[in-house]
């Protein structure tokens, strides 16, 4: 059985983002105007960044769960350019992460527990099915990888 651990993260996240877009995951009206954290200077360049972030959060919860908003904020943070002063690490936007988690909960892919958010059995099978599709695509491109 193919799992999330068996395929490259970038291809899995891209494919998951496409599937989430097909599932009509909710998109807040402010996504076109916000930065993804204090450490960023501009908004994301990609128009579908919301779906990519939701897919990335879903993958992180699958791998590291149970996980809370604070840990995810740290994962999506970065160094802030402060001019002449030394750079410091700043956490990512908590509002973006909270809203993404709420949308994933509405779809039934993630649920709240006292320890943090975890992937539901539906979410686990959703990601495993996508991982199988990604693995099949990779094997079609490079047949030598079929033995792995």
UniProtKB/Swiss-Prot annotation:
Q: Name one GO cellular component term.
A: cytosolic small ribosomal subunit
Entry keywords, A to Z: Ribonucleoprotein, Ribosomal protein
Q: What's an example Gene Ontology biological process for this entry?
A: translation
Q: Keyword Ribonucleoprotein, does the record have it?
A: yes
Matching SMART domains: Ribosomal_S19e
GO MF? RNA binding; structural constituent of ribosome
**Assembly mode:** Part of the 30S ribosomal subunit.
Give the family this protein belongs to, as stated in its UniProt record. Belongs to the eukaryotic ribosomal protein eS19 family.
Give a short account of what the protein does.
May be involved in maturation of the 30S ribosomal subunit.
Its recorded name reads Small ribosomal subunit protein eS19
| Species of provenance | Methanocaldococcus jannaschii (strain ATCC 43067 / DSM 2661 / JAL-1 / JCM 10045 / NBRC 100440) (Methanococcus jannaschii)
């Amino acid at each position: 059985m193919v799992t999330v651990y068996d395929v490259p993260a970038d291809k899995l996240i891209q494919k998951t983002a496409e599937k989430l877009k097909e599932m009509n995951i909710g998109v807040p009206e402010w996504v076109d105007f916000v930065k993804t954290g204090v450490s960023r200077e501009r908004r994301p360049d990609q128009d579908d960044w919301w779906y990519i972030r939701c897919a990335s959060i879903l993958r992180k919860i699958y791998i590291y769960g149970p996980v809370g908003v604070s840990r995810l904020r740290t994962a999506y943070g970065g160094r802030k350019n402060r001019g002449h002063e030394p750079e410091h690490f700043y956490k990512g936007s908590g509002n973006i992460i909270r809203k993404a988690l709420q949308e994933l909960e509405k779809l039934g892919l993630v649920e709240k527990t006292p320890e943090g958010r975890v992937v539901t059995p539906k979410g686990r099978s959703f990601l495993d099915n996508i991982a199988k599709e990604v693995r099949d695509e990779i094997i079609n491109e490079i047949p030598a990888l079929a033995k792995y």
